[in-house]
From Swiss-Prot:
Designated name of the protein: Small ribosomal subunit protein eS1
Keywords attached to this entry: Cytoplasm, Ribonucleoprotein, Ribosomal protein
Disulfide bond positions: none
Any Gene Ontology CC annotation: cytosol
Organism, scientific name: Caenorhabditis elegans
Length: 257
């Protein structure tokens, strides 16, 4: 057998596959926030087009979007983030509902103080429409008027009483409300202000905030209630949309079929 280079190059089985742009199979959907917020159009999201049994709208349901409250309410100075969960799709609009709330890490670091007592509390509360929320609150002790002492620490027994008052305030504010009313209270953080006012009789407090809220149990999606939250965001359904045409309009004739 002759030793040498074989010049008869055999082609590989199958030709070179043509590169396909993955974005050509995707389509954009608008993310709509509930009407508790000033800005309703908060962004866009991508999903593969409907193919066979894979329906695009079903793939969007359950997606969670994190948006700053500053973007939702057109305010520059805000340190809270809201998570919105997609619950329904109408046309090209993704209808979302409240999912969670938290403070930014920078804000949490900025409120921590030396020579003060940090007090935290959390409790699970149920709303009137069947949601179970876990609410976390954070607070710091404050120097009393004309205090000379450098530190403002409080006793453990008093911390327990303050924590009990915090939980009582949260239950009072949330238990008799539905989820929409709770979110309306979280936006200006009125619950934190009420806690600070109530606990001041035990020990003066400062920097009292609802640190985090998360849903630990949610009922089945109520489309009627969800559509009420998105009254002006719902697009035209299967009946289509009316298009204004002149009376003498004639459709163009196709050149090829």
């Amino acid at each position: 057998m002759a030793v040498g280079k074989n010049n008869n190059k055999m082609g590989k089985k199958g030709g070179k596959k043509k590169a396909v742009d993955p974005f050509s199979r995707k389509e954009w959907y608008d993310i709509k926030a509930p009407n508790m917020f000033n800005t309703r159009q908060v962004g866009k999201t991508l999903i593969n087009r409907t193919q066979g049994t894979k329906i695009a709208s079903e793939g969007l349901k359950g997606r969670v979007f994190e948006v700053s409250l500053g973007d939702l309410n057109n305010s520059e100075a805000d340190f809270r983030k809201f998570k919105l969960i997609a619950e329904d799709v109408q046309g090209k609009n993704v209808l979302t509902n409240f999912h969670a709330m938290s403070m930014t890490h920078d804000k949490l670091c900025s409120i921590v103080k030396k020579w003060h007592t940090l007090i935290e509390a959390n409790t699970a509360v149920k709303t009137t429409d069947g949601y179970t929320l876990r609410v976390f609150v954070i607070a710091f002790t404050k120097k009393s008027v004309n205090q000379v002492k450098k530190t403002s620490y409080t006793k453990t027994s008093k911390i327990r009483k303050i924590r009990s008052e915090m939980i009582g305030c949260i239950e009072k504010e949330v238990t008799g409300c539905d989820l929409k009313e709770v979110v309306s209270k979280l936006i200006p953080d009125s619950i934190g202000k009420d806690i600070e006012k109530t606990c001041s009789k035990l020990y003066p407090l400062q920097e009292v905030y609802i640190r985090k809220v998360k849903i630990i149990k949610r009922p089945k999606v109520d489309l009627g209630r969800l559509h009420d939250l998105h009254g002006d965001s719902i697009t035209v359904g299967a009946d289509g949309e009316k298009v204004d045409r002149p009376d003498d309009y004639e459709p163009p004739v196709q050149q090829e079929v």
